[in-house]
Amino acid sequence: MPGQAGRRRLVGGGCRGSQGPLGGAATMLRSLLLHSLRLCAQTASCLVLFPRFLGTACMLWLLDFLCIRKHLLGRRRRGEPETEVELNSDGDEVPPDDPPICVSDDNRLCTLASLRAVWHGQKLDFFKQAHEGGPAPNSEVVLPDGFQNQHILDYARGNRPLVLNFGSCTUPPFMARMSAFQRLVTKYQRDVDFLIIYIEEAHPSDGWVTTDSPYSIPQHRSLEDRVSAARVLQQGAPECSLVLDTMANSSSSAYGAYFERLYVIQSGTIMYQGGRGPDGYQVSELRTWLERYDQQLHGPQPRRV
């Protein structure tokens, strides 16, 4: 009997020992398969993105010729529809929601830094999880006070729409349209919640530099750097809640928000997805959505027959 028990122990130990190498090989094979699939996905995305990236690069190269730049930007301004002049309570003219994008003559657009930034933005847009009509990603954000981790949907309250405004201080269109965004906050905050999410710098002083940027801020190396930059923005947007994207840029990646972008979330669903900045960043589109929502909410109810 003792001999049989010893033999059984040897047989059991031998089986476990033989399964060890097989289990390790299976784990290695599974890991190799995942890496291969990830590589195939990256390769496929590069093939899909490259034509668009090449077109953008050619456009930036052409815009470095001042005669072409002035002609194209001037034609774009002339092609924009004239908006009705709006007056404030003091009778002064209110600036337009989307002032034209200005590019100074001394700014080069086609550089290695600019191409890297364009590729980064297009890749984030391609892989984003957020799509109009779909579920809103509940990505992580950080409070500037205390560095407490929260999630975007923590700021959604019941059935109230939540407006997300992604951007940074070194992005000229984002800063130029901040006053228009603030007017919307003041007008609709009774029924709508607003949240600014400070993301990585669009034009850092150690990256794609532009003299049109109102501030000179380097790339964020830590959350402390991002907080310091966000404080500058917070001074100009005191009525709106502000949070930071994580240093892994989880929210910017989930929403494809680089360089800047606008979203509206309601009941966990993306109701409005603005275009990717700079060209697609249109506060006037957000205003139109809010006006329609306000009309549905407070407009006359149809009479029952």
Swiss-Prot record:
| SUPFAM superfamilies named in the record | Thioredoxin-like
Q: Which residues lie on this side of the membrane: Extracellular?
A: 64-305
Q: Which GO terms describe its biological process?
A: hormone biosynthetic process; thyroid hormone catabolic process; thyroid hormone metabolic process
Catalytic activity, EC? 1.21.99.3
Primary localisation category? membrane
The record's listing under InterPro entries reads: Iodothyronine_deiodinase (IPR000643), Iodothyronine_deiodinase_AS (IPR008261), Iodothyronine_deiodinase_I/III (IPR027252), Thioredoxin-like_sf (IPR036249)
Subcellular localization is given as: Cell membrane; Endosome membrane
> Which stretches face the Cytoplasmic side?
1-43
- Which residue positions does the secretion signal occupy? none
Which reaction(s) does its UniProt entry say it catalyses?
3,3',5'-triiodo-L-thyronine + iodide + A + H(+) = L-thyroxine + AH2; 3,3'-diiodo-L-thyronine + iodide + A + H(+) = 3,3',5-triiodo-L-thyronine + AH2; 3-iodo-L-thyronine + iodide + A + H(+) = 3,5-diiodo-L-thyronine + AH2; L-thyronine + iodide + A + H(+) = 3-iodo-L-thyronine + AH2
The membrane-spanning stretches of this chain are 44-63
Highest taxon of the source? Eukaryota
Q: What does this protein do?
A: Plays a crucial role in the metabolism of thyroid hormones (TH) and has specific roles in TH activation and inactivation by deiodination, particularly in different tissues. Catalyzes the deiodination of L-thyroxine (T4) to 3,3',5'-triiodothyronine (rT3), 3,5-diiodothyronine (3,5-T2) to 3-monoiodothyronine (3-T1), rT3 to 3',5'-diiodothyronine (3',5'-T2) and 3,3'-diiodothyronine (3,3'-T2) to 3'-monoiodothyronine (3'-T1) via inner-ring deiodination (IRD). Catalyzes the deiodination of 3,5,3'-triiodothyronine (T3) to 3,3'-diiodothyronine (3,3'-T2) via IRD.
Please state what the protein is called: Thyroxine 5-deiodinase
Organism expressing this protein natively: Sus scrofa
